[in-house]
């Protein structure tokens, strides 16, 4: 499987039979193999995660399906694509036979929309959307504590569901200042993943080496992808001599 970081929270994953496009709102999309089924995921309606331009892909990729958070208004979807679009609430599970078989489970965000857990081609893939430990300096302590409680509760639900992702895409947001690492750290400690790909860092790639320097990341830092630019492409499983990245381009 290949993983391409597009921009912000946008990722393209390619398996032998399917293309999985997550939260593509900005950036340059890599070439898409027309012989493969394309599944387009949108975690919520905010413009840094959702752009109506995704629907233009149907013109050049007829084997397409849209899996959208239920907070996205249905009138945002062109009428001729209604039959190719599904809306998910937290707790929903959807399955397709196409693309080698695909099963999607939605979890509740601590902000808007949903997080996605996708099982396909022998892989388990997690995209957090805005499910994160959104603690902020200057916010009331009770609000922050409630945020952490809700986030960890949702992670425990994921763990209790038996999921252990091969690949996880999780926010690492420098706007949280010294609290930037909390959500990803919680995720790796409670759920875990074979490889974790940071996202939602607003072009501040420095948060990735900053995370790896923290003592708390000692147990998993070699499983954090070294993303340095938009369009960077990785392999999973990663090359044995470069597990922390597996970069191909």
Stretches with model-predicted labels:
Residues 1-35, 85-164, 229-249:
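Core dinuclear metal-dependent hydrolase active-site scaffold
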Residues 4-8, 77-97, 181-249:
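Binuclear metal-ion centers of metallo-dependent hydrolases, dominated by the metallo-beta-lactamase
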Residues 26-74, 159-169:
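Active-site metal-binding motif and surrounding structural segment of the metallo-beta-lactamase
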Residues 27-30, 46-50, 72-76, 93-95, ...:
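Active-site environment of divalent metal-dependent phosphoester hydrolases
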Residues 39-40, 56-60, 143-146, 185-188, ...:
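Glycine-rich, phosphate-binding/catalytic loops in enzymes
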Residues 41, 103-106, 168-171, 196-198:
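Short catalytic-loop micro-motif centered on adjacent basic/acidic residues
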Residues 67-69, 107, 128, 198-199, ...:
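Generic beta-sheet signal
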Residues 152-158, 177-186:
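A short, acidic, amphipathic alpha-helical segment used as a generic capping/interface helix at domain edges
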């Amino acid at each position: 499987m290949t993983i391409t970081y597009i921009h912000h929270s946008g990722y393209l994953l390619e398996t032998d039979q399917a293309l999985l496009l997550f939260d593509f709102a900005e950036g340059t999309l890599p070439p898409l193999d027309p012989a493969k089924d394309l599944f387009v995921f949108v975690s919520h309606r905010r413009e840094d995660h959702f752009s109506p331009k995704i629907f233009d892909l149907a013109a050049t990729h007829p084997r397409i399906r849209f899996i959208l958070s239920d907070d996205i208004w249905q009138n945002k979807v062109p009428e001729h694509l209604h039959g190719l679009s599904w809306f998910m609430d937290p707790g929903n599970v959807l399955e397709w036979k196409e693309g080698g078989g695909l099963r999607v489970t939605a979890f509740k965000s601590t902000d808007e929309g949903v997080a996605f857990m996708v099982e396909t081609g022998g892989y388990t893939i997690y995209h957090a959307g805005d499910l994160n430990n959104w603690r902020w300096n200057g916010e009331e302590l009770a609000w922050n504590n409630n945020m952490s409680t809700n986030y960890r509760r949702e992670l425990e639900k994921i763990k209790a569901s038996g999921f252990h992702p091969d690949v996880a895409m999780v926010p690492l947001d420098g706007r949280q200042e010294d609290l930037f690492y909390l959500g990803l750290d919680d995720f790796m400690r409670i759920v875990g993943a074979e490889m974790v790909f940071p996202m939602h860092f607003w072009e501040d790639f420095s948060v990735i080496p900053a995370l790896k320097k923290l003592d708390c990341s000692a147990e998993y830092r070699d499983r954090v992808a070294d993303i340095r630019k938009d369009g960077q492409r990785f392999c999973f499983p990663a090359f044995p001599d470069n597990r922390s990245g597996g970069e191909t381009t």
